[in-house]
A protein has these predicted regions:
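Conserved glycine-rich cofactor-binding loop
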Residues: 75, 82-83
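Residue(s) in the substrate-gating loop at a strand-loop-helix junction
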Residues: 211
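C-terminal helical subdomain
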Residues: 251, 268-307, 311, 315, ...
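Amphipathic terminal alpha-helices
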Residues: 12-14, 22-75, 327-358
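Active-site helix of classical SDR
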Residues: 191, 227
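Conserved mid-core segment of classical short-chain dehydrogenase/reductases
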Residues: 161-177, 220
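The beta1-alpha1 cofactor-binding region of Rossmann-like NAD(H)/NADP(H)-dependent oxidoreductases
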Residues: 128-139, 173
Length: 358
C-alpha cells in the first residue's frame, strides 16, 4: 500500500498484486435455484458495471485538484521571492489563498512583491535574509517559526548561476564556493531548520528548484550544475527517511527561464526560454500533485542519452561547447557589449534544444 501511495496509485490495487482475481457465482446460483432467474455470463455486463463505477463511484472524481485546495490556509515559504520565478510563484499561490512568506535579500523588491499580493487580496509576510549566509538563514528560520509556528510548503528557489568554461576557471575556485554556498548549503540549512516542525506535524512539502542542466550536463556550467546536482542527491536520500512522516520532496528540473539570473548572458536574448509565470505554473502543479520529480521531455531525453550512450552525449555537447563561446564577462572583461551575436547555427541549435542552458 505504501509503495502504491508513493507512486500515486489507488491503494485498492494492492489486492490485485499478489494473486489473480477470480469471480465465483456458485453462491448466487444456489440462491437463485428454482426461481427461474439465471446468472448472465460475466463478460456480458462487467464492462457496464466498471464504466458506471468509473463515471459515478470512483472516489478520485470527488477530489478537488485545484491549487486553492492544495494551498488555501497553508503557510508557503518561497526563497528568491523578490523577482523572477519566486515572485511569480508567490503571486500565484497567494491568489489561491496561501499565507506566503517572502524571503530574499532585497527589502525594496520584497516590499514591492508584498504590495502586489495585498492589492490582490492576498496575505504575505516579509522575512529578509541573505541566503548565502548560514547564520542569517538560522536567524530567519527561527523568526519564521516564532511568528508562524510552522511552514507547510517550502520552495527552495533562490539560486546563483555562473557560466564559465573550465579553462577560465583555474584561478576561480571561489565560483564553485559561491554556487555551492547558495544553491546547496543554503537550501540544506533551511531544510534542516524547518524539517523538525514538518515531521512533528506529520505533513509537509519541500520543493527544490533544480535545473535541466543536471540532466543534460551543458558545457560551461560546471559550478552551477554541480551545486544543483548536490541538492538533487540530498533530496533523493532523505526522501526515504521521511515517508512515515508524510513529508514529500519534489525536485523540479527547470528549463531556461527568462529571469534576471540569465540577463548577464546577452546571447540568451535570442534563445527560447519560458516565462517566470510558466515556471510558476510548473511549481503550482507540483504543489497539487506532489510528484517526486518534474522535468521536461528534453531533460528526460538528455538524462536517458547520457545513461545509455555517454560518449555520444559528450560528442553532442562538445558541438554546443564550440558553438557557444565564453562571454566577455566570463573572460573578466566588463564591456559585455563586445560579445558577438550568436551564429545562425548556434541559434538553430538552441531552438532545437529548447530550454537547455548553453
Amino acid at each position: 500500500k505504501l509503495a502504491l501511495d508513493q507512486a500515486g496509485l489507488p491503494a485498492e490495487l494492492h489486492t490485485y498484486v499478489d494473486y489473480p482475481t477470480s469471480f465465483d457465482s456458485t453462491k448466487t446460483q444456489k440462491a437463485l435455484k428454482g426461481s427461474g432467474i439465471e446468472v448472465p455470463p460475466l463478460e456480458t455486463y462487467a464492462t457496464r458495471v466498471w464504466d458506471y463505477w468509473e463515471r459515478n463511484l470512483d472516489p478520485d472524481l470527488f477530489k478537488d485538484r485545484s491549487l486553492s485546495a492544495a494551498v488555501r490556509g497553508k503557510v508557503v515559504l518561497i526563497t528568491g521571492a523578490s523577482s523572477g520565478i519566486g515572485k511569480a510563484t508567490a503571486l500565484k499561490v497567494a491568489g489561491a489563498g496561501a499565507t506566503v512568506l517572502l524571503v530574499a535579500r532585497s527589502l525594496d523588491k520584497l516590499e514591492a512583491t508584498k504590495e502586489e499580493i495585498v492589492a490582490g487580496g492576498g496575505t504575505a509576510h516579509i522575512h529578509q535574509c541573505d541566503l548565502s549566509d548560514i547564520e542569517d538563514i538560522e536567524r530567519m528560520a527561527e523568526e519564521v517559526l516564532t511568528y508562524h509556528g510552522h511552514v507547510d510548503i517550502l520552495v527552495n528557489n533562490a539560486g546563483r548561476s555562473i557560466r564559465r568554461s573550465i579553462a577560465l576557471s583555474y584561478d576561480r575556485y571561489h565560483d564553485f564556493e559561491r554556487t555551492i554556498q547558495l544553491n546547496y548549503l543554503g537550501a540544506v540549512r533551511l531544510i534542516l531548520a524547518l524539517l523538525p516542525a514538518m515531521r512533528g506535524r506529520k505533513q509537509g512539502h519541500i520543493i527544490n528548484i533544480s535545473s535541466i542542466g543536471t540532466q543534460t550536463n551543458p558545457p560551461r556550467f560546471s559550478a552551477y550544475v554541480a551545486s544543483k546536482a548536490a541538492l538533487d542527491a540530498f533530496s533523493r536520500v532523505i526522501a526515504s527517511e521521511l515517508v512515515d512522516d508524510k513529508v514529500h520532496l519534489t525536485t523540479i528540473n527547470m528549463p531556461l527561464v527568462r529571469t534576471p539570473m540569465i540577463a548577464p548572458t546577452r546571447m540568451y536574448d535570442m534563445f527560447p526560454a519560458i516565462t517566470p509565470e510558466e515556471a510558476a505554473e510548473m511549481i503550482a502543479k507540483a504543489m497539487i500533485n506532489r510528484p517526486k520529480k518534474v522535468a521536461t521531455r528534453l531533460g528526460n531525453f538528455g538524462e536517458l542519452l547520457y545513461a545509455v550512450a555517454p560518449k555520444a552525449s559528450d560528442s553532442l555537447l562538445n558541438t554546443a561547447y564550440k558553438l557557444f563561446p565564453d562571454s566577455q564577462a566570463a573572460k573578466g572583461k566588463k564591456d559585455e557589449a563586445r560579445d558577438k551575436p550568436p551564429s545562425t547555427e548556434a541559434v538553430a541549435f538552441a531552438h532545437l534544444m529548447k530550454g537547455v542552458h548553453w
